[in-house]
Amino acid sequence: HSTTKYMDGHALTVGGCIVDSGNFDWNAHAEKFPGLTTPDDSYHGVVYTEKFGKKAYITKATSQLMRDLGSIPSPTNCFLLNLGLETLPLRVERHCYNAQKIAEFLNAHEKVSHVNYAGLPDDKYYALAQKYMNEGRTCGVISFELTGGRDAAVRFMDSLKLATIATHVAASITMVLHPASHTHRQMNDEQLVEAGVSPGMI
């Protein structure tokens, strides 16, 4: 999971975290996980699944992978992430509330052809959101498509006054991204559609 997003809340740090419940049977799929089910020469030939059982993955991550990749955040980053955790429930609840209102507004707008948001009853993931999400709240991220395609999306982005244009999402401010001209700008329209990104998507 990215800790840069909601956990931080202000896009001040870059990082990630591993959540491992210790319930996955690595040996049942041994061919897919040779790093856990075969000897690790860098740790005296230990086979993590044999030595650590259900804790095989998290043990490998905190011993061999941290050693090799150096994926340890600085003390300042840890402080900022911990600070962000203090207000996480309040912020996420408000993100969800705000996103729901915006999604409903966009869904009724004549210049919007489609809204992707699991909090809307006509969304293909609505039933799952109601089943699995706390009180049916989904998230703070919405995507929508303007009827005018790429040109309309560019005009929309150029007209923004309150929201910040950014490739980073899920912080405490409202951020907007046009993938066709930002994260996927190297692709032509045909390639965008193949990648599941329409030219007019915001």
Where in this protein do the model-derived segments appear?
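Short beta->alpha connector loops at strand-helix junctions that form conserved
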Residues: H1-T4
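Active-site C-terminal subdomain of aminotransferase-like
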Residues: M7-V141, E145-H178
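Flexible, small-/acidic-enriched active-site or ligand-binding loops
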Residues: T164-M201
